[in-house]
């Protein structure tokens, strides 16, 4: 499973959305109807899965699925 697939699977599970709705351009709030609690839980799950901490400042910048994928790729390299 690719990083992109892993991230999308986590988002589907955490937000209860359809896999077809999770695109790199999807906004968590506008397109996937996430609220602040959803986003906090999503960040915690991503931190656990990928074994690094996401600062509050960084988390605020992660607005789309693509933002998260790019952020994790940068942290892993």
UniProtKB/Swiss-Prot annotation:
One of its GO terms (molecular function) is acyl binding. It comes from the Bacteria. Pfam families: PP-binding (PF00550). InterPro entries: ACP, ACP-like_sf, PP-bd_ACP, Ppantetheine_attach_site. Its main location: cytoplasm. Residues 1-76 form the Carrier domain. This is Acyl carrier protein. It comes from Chlamydia muridarum (strain MoPn / Nigg). The gene is acpP.
């Amino acid at each position: 499973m690719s990083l992109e697939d892993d991230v999308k699977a986590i988002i589907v599970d955490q937000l209860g959305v359809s896999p077809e709705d999770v695109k790199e351009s999807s906004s968590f709030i506008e397109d996937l109807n996430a609220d602040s609690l959803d986003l906090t839980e999503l960040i915690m799950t991503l931190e656990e899965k990928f074994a690094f901490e996401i600062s509050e400042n960084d988390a605020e910048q992660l607005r789309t699925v693509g933002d998260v994928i790019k952020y994790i790729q940068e942290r892993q390299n």
